[in-house]
Amino acid sequence: MMRFTKSLLASVALCSLLSLPARAELDVAKLKTTIEASVENDYPKLDALYKDLHAHPEIAFQEVKTAAKLAAEMRAIGFEVTEQVGKTGLVAIYKNGDGPTIMVRTELDALPMEEKTGLPYASHDTTNWNGRETPVAHSCGHDIHMASWVGTAKTLVGLKDQWHGTLMFIAQPAEEEIAGAKAMLDDGLFTRFPKPDVGFALHDGASAYGTVSYRVGIGSSNQDGLFIRFHGRGGHGAMPQNTIDPVMIAARFVVDVQSVISREKDPTEFGVVSIGAIHGGTAGNIIPDNALVVGTIRTFKPEVRTKMLAGIERTAKAVAAMADAPPPDINLDAGAKAVVNDPAVVATAEKVLKAAFGDKIRTTPPNTTSEDYSEYVNAGVPSMFFNI
């Protein structure tokens, strides 16, 4: 119950504060007591919703049943709901007089992996993923986020005499593929619906139990995909002199590219290149015609990202040229940009968080993982992304 309670308290307190008239003062202690009582009353239903979502996960852009469940919950609370925004996303609007528009986001999607928790409500569902029947599991906590999102909406509506403005609750597909935020924006999220004055999102994590953590400025990393196909000339493994071995070229690249990190990037700045897969060949005695290297690139600052991308491309071309091979096919696929928390929003929200949670509030270094909530920030929504 603690994770639900903490996330609800944080979300509701933040939204309530920023929806109040400028002249009003927020009685945090009283609000906290009211919220805790509301959460206590609603918890059995929220827990049941969480377990149902956990047991029946859906992967990116397949979240049809998940979205339908959330749509039904939000309509029952009194929100006006629009479905199929950005394919499987939904937007829920609650108007409560004049005032700012506050956006709260949750994610819908799960991951293509097997659950091994042994929980009584563990997922046993599978789906077709990349042509294979694959297990699906909520291993990143989006089920917790969704249940908290619904609970936050219900609690805020119950507190509607204490705030005014418009609540814009969005349920986003395909966060795991860094694609859902852009899909919703491309489908008119901020033209078909009010553009938010302030936005919030949260993520559960493995920090100390019961803490709420955040930071001003950069909160997560830029993410770029690395897909490089090295070309060679295949042949028999016993006669390598008649071939150009793309596996050898790929292996040299995997090692040499790390010099971009150790010798070109400023060692005081964050940046990593991690290679997660190498695909090439069919048998041990056959040198293939090509080999594919797949990886990820993470950075915080734009100038570091630019330097690293240039170094990676230069290294790939160089190792191919060393082997007298054709130039490689290089695709450095731009993904999520860094989430940047707005200083003014954080400063305002921080007062409420500290009053509500005391020494459970922590400021943290930037997270080296990535998150496509940055799409909303870059579209002009001052935001705060925090962790529970």
List the predicted regions and their residue ranges.
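Soluble non-cytosolic domains of exported or imported proteins
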Residues: 29, 40-44, 60-68, 143-147, ...
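Acidic/His- and Gly-rich active-site-bordering loop/insert found
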Residues: 25-138, 147-164
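Metal-dependent amide/peptide-bond hydrolase catalytic core
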Residues: 25-26, 30, 251-388
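Divalent metal-coordination and catalytic microenvironments
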Residues: 53, 74, 92, 104, ...
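Sec/Tat-exported extracytoplasmic proteins
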Residues: 39-46, 50, 54-57, 61, ...
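Histidine/acidic-residue-rich, glycine-tolerant segments that coordinate divalent metal ions
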Residues: 126-137, 143-144, 155, 159-277, ...
